[in-house]
């Protein structure tokens, strides 16, 4: 008993210390609830795709596609991480990185170019200032960007940056080049090779929708030009500072959170392109940031840059290209489907594709603005078009300073980075003249027709500086300020300004350029619109002939808007410049000094700036999509010099001054991207769709005799416009279509101008819901000349639209219209019978 009694007091505390007090049931539940909800969410996310596959009746191939997409995402993320580590190692210790071995394209600019200086003193200064730069950037995000995003939309009212850390790695200048030749004596031009590899963390959150996203690393590389002008005799000796990129910089972003979806193949290039386009709107030539250093400097004059000249590129032909298409696993050599990518600064042009030809003839013309010719080159790359990845056929790079000296070059150039191949170019440097003395001669040289206002080569350049507007009306609502934007058009070319929100006194300070075919017959049309209510706030029409009689062919004033308020005005500065080719007399044995610039890095490294920017979709809509330097269509072209024969040994042959009647065709497009060729998928699915339609037709027949047009008919108007140099197709309506489901059909019309079945050549109408007799009344056009269109066939297909992953998609009928008719210029309207495969071409005579 005593022992028991002795154990009691000793054991009691021991049990009390070893056993915790019982917890309340509510507290245990509150601790496990988040984990339970997370487990349920993960289980739901895993089971939902399985349920969706069964519910929609999809095949197992969708599972394989998802796994392949996941593997691709992980591989892409791993490659991004390796590139980031390599760039960080190069920034931390250049000498050690070079010893260990680094690719030539990753080396700094001062290694390749002797006139580029290494500026370590500048990098040390930036490194010392970097913590304070980071503080400024954090304040910019939290005090400027965050309130602006919150006020932009009611759904973003809870938007906030949870973390803004730019990282410890400072911005680095890999090389500095100062220009001393071909520059104005009152300016200093510097090119900075900048590189930023930041292990930054920028996280954002929208609490209202439990949405988190962010960025964990950013890489940006590019050439930034700094211009100090004008130099003055008083302190601080420089009037203003202008900063811009010569071309779009290279950009790579690693996303976190919800924005990880942007790393999915197909979306990663699109997201980077959108961000690059935003940067281009502010910082890529001709856009620039101008900082005045003294009050006396006319900042508006610095923001109204006049191009140094216009480069007219005759992209004529190539010879002896490599055959990249092979058969039987390379045993049989084939030909190539060559096309060219031409680049001048930030302007990118793409030629048409010549099928199966090693000596293609393009005969196309491009016109490009040149703002800063010191440091700018004409870059050309040739590729063989393939369904998967286009093969490289050669490149060429020509310094624009040499072209300016020569004024006219008509030569065969040997392609670089390939064993064989030559390219025939004719380059013209057009000077901008501020008077109309040579206008008649220029119009005669380009054969400008009096009845032809806007087609053909350009005779002049219109430069417009949109400053501001005052006293704009309120639009539809009296008590609300409008969201004004300005639409400007000359002929068929139109451009838009940025939107200024909630103001009747907008300030734009934007530059625009238009190539003009005949300034005596064309007008500048300007309209101010309210983006919020889609209504007009005022308009203005200025005949370009008015500029011909103005002082220095320039007008700088406030214009009274019509159909607007009594005091509504728009301030603009407009200048017209005549494009004049100054031909120089040369002796017969004259040898020009133009040299082809050889690449200093490998083909993969040098092509990165071009190929990285060729992923933008040209079909993106919205403001600022109209190019400021469009390729001009050529209908009546001047006769050009006979094409010289390619040289046997020298890359630069002698000029043949013989004459012939050969002419150049129009360039089909001015785009910023090389489009894929989706016709492969269309060709694969076509037999399946035709087979399904035939089976559906047999079910409809079911022992009965169908009429003459069992699939129905479609009404089209087809004509060719010689003034616009386009084929016009109007889709009016369809009748007596077959029902694709119990609710009828959801038809739309798709068209190709064969043999072109690329995405850029496709035209589609809107979808008419639940009807067998849809009415479209939509007009479409194809840029093609009359002789060319008479050798083509119009492929028209009526299809049934369905929802995403729907089984109700399919073909309702096709028709092939052979356009070999002499009545095409007049046009016709006709009903066409739909067939299951369109194998009965319908010829109009």
UniProtKB/Swiss-Prot annotation:
GO terms for biological process: endocytosis; endoplasmic reticulum-plasma membrane tethering; lipid transport. It is a peripheral membrane protein; Multi-pass membrane protein. Ca(2+) 3 binds at residues 386, 388, 390. InterPro entries: C2_dom (IPR000008), C2_domain_sf (IPR035892), C2C_KIAA1228 (IPR037752), Ext_Synaptotagmin_C2A (IPR037733), Ext_Synaptotagmin_C2B (IPR037749), Extended_Synaptotagmin (IPR051634), SMP_LBD (IPR031468), Synaptotagmin_SMP (IPR039010). SMART domains: C2. GO terms for cellular component: cytoplasmic side of plasma membrane; cytosol; endoplasmic reticulum membrane; endoplasmic reticulum-plasma membrane contact site; organelle membrane contact site. Ca(2+) 1 binds at residues 324-325, 384, 386, 391. Residues 1-17 have a biased composition (Gly residues). GO terms for molecular function: calcium ion binding; phosphatidylcholine binding; phosphatidylethanolamine binding; phosphatidylinositol binding. Residues 1-27, 73-845 are cytoplasmic. It is found in: Cell membrane; Endoplasmic reticulum membrane. Residues 612-628 have a biased composition (Polar residues). Residues 49-51 are lumenal. Ca(2+) 2 binds at residues 325, 337, 384-386. It holds the Pfam family C2. Residues 293-413, 442-563, 710-832 form the C2 domain. Its main location: membrane. Residues 757-764 are annotated as: Required for phosphatidylinositol 4,5-bisphosphate-dependent location at the cell membrane. PANTHER family: EXTENDED SYNAPTOTAGMIN-2, EXTENDED SYNAPTOTAGMIN-LIKE PROTEIN 2, ISOFORM C. Homodimer. Interacts with ESYT1 and ESYT3. Interacts with FGFR1 that has been activated by FGF1 binding. Interacts with the AP-2 complex; identified in a complex with the AP-2 complex and FGFR1. This is Extended synaptotagmin-2. It comes from Mus musculus. The gene is Esyt2.
């Amino acid at each position: 008993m005593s022992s028991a009694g002795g154990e009691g007091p000793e054991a009691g505390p021991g049990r009390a210390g070893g056993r915790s007090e019982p917890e309340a049931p509510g507290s245990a539940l509150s601790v496990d609830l988040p984990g339970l909800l997370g487990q349920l969410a993960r289980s739901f996310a895993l089971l939902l795709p399985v349920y969706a596959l069964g519910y929609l009746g999809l095949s197992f191939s969708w599972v394989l596609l998802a796994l392949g997409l996941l593997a691709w995402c992980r591989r892409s993320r791993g490659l991004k991480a390796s590139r980031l580590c390599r760039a960080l190692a190069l920034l931390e210790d250049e000498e050690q990185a070079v010893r260990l071995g680094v690719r030539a394209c990753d080396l700094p600019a001062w290694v390749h170019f002797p006139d580029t200086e290494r500026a370590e003193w500048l990098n040390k200064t930036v490194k010392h200032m970097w913590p304070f730069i980071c503080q400024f950037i954090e304040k910019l995000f939290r005090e400027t960007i965050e309130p602006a995003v919150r006020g932009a939309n009611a759904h973003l009212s809870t938007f906030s940056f949870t973390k803004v850390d730019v990282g410890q790695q400072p911005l680095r200048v890999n090389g500095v080049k100062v220009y001393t030749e071909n520059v104005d004596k009152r300016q200093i031009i510097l090119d900075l090779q900048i590189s930023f590899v930041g292990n930054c963390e920028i996280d954002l959150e929208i609490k209202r929708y439990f949405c988190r996203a962010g960025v964990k690393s950013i890489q940006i590389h590019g050439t930034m030009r700094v211009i100090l002008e004008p130099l003055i005799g008083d302190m601080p000796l420089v009037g203003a500072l202008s900063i811009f990129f010569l071309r779009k910089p290279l950009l790579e972003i690693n996303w976190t959170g919800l924005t990880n979806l942007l790393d999915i193949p197909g979306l990663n290039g699109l997201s980077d392109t959108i961000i690059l386009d935003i940067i281009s709107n502010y910082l890529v030539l001709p856009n620039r940031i101008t900082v005045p250093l003294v009050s006396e400097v006319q900042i508006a004059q610095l923001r109204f840059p006049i191009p140094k000249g216009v480069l007219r590129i005759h992209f004529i032909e190539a010879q002896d290209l490599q055959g990249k298409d092979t058969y039987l696993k390379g045993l049989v050599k084939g030909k190539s489907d060559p096309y060219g990518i031409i680049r001048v600064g930030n302007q990118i042009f793409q030629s048409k594709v010549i099928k199966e030809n090693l000596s293609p003839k393009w005969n196309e013309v491009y016109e490009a603005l040149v703002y800063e010719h010191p440091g700018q080159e004409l870059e050309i790359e040739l590729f063989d078009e393939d369904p998967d990845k286009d093969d490289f056929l050669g490149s060429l790079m020509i310094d624009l300073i040499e072209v300016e000296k020569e004024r006219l070059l008509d030569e065969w150039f040997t392609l670089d980075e390939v064993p064989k191949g030559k390219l025939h170019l004719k380059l013209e440097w057009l000077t901008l003249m501020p008077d109309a003395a040579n206008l008649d001669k220029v119009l005669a040289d380009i054969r400008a027709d009096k009845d032809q206002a806007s087609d053909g080569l350009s005779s002049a350049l219109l430069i417009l500086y949109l400053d501001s507007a005052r006293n704009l009306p309120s639009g539809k609502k009296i008590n609300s300020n409008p969201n004004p934007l300005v639409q400007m058009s000359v002929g068929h070319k139109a451009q838009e300004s940025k939107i200024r929100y909630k103001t009747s006194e907008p300030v734009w300070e934007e530059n625009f350029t238009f190539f003009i075919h005949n300034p005596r017959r064309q007008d500048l049309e300007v309209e101010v619109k309210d983006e919020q209510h889609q209504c007009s706030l005022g308009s203005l029409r200025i005949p370009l002939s008015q500029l011909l009689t103005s002082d220095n062919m320039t007008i700088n004033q406030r214009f009274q808007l019509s159909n607007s308020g009594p005091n509504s005005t728009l301030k603009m500065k407009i200048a017209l410049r005549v494009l004049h080719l100054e031909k120089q007399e040369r002796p017969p044995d004259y040898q020009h000094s133009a040299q082809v610039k050889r690449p200093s890095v490998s083909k993969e490294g040098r092509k990165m700036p071009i190929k990285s920017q060729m992923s933008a979709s040209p079909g993106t809509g919205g403001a600022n999509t109209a190019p400021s330097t469009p390729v001009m269509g050529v209908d009546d072209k001047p006769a050009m010099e006979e094409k010289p024969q390619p040289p046997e040994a020298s890359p630069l042959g002698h000029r043949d001054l013989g004459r012939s009647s050969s002419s150049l065709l129009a360039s089909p497009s001015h785009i910023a991207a090389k489009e894929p060729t989706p016709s492969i998928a269309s060709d694969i699915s076509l037999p399946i769709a035709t087979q399904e339609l035939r089976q559906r037709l047999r079910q409809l027949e079911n022992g009965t005799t169908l009429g003459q047009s069992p699939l129905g008919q479609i009404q089209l108007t087809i004509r060719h416009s010689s003034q616009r140099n386009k084929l016009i197709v109007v889709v009016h309506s369809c009748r007596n279509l077959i029902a694709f489901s119990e609710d009828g059909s959801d038809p739309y019309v798709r068209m190709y101008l064969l043999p072109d079945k690329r995405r850029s050549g496709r035209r589609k109408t809107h979808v008419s819901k639940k009807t067998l007799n849809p009415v479209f009344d939509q007009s479409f056009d194809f840029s093609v000349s009359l002789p060319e269109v008479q050798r083509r066939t119009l492929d028209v297909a009526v299809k049934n639209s369905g929802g995403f992953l729907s089984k109700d998609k399919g073909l309702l009928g096709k028709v092939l219209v052979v356009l070999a008719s002499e009545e095409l210029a007049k046009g016709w309207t006709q009903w066409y019978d739909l067939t299951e495969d369109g194998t009965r071409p319908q010829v109009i005579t």
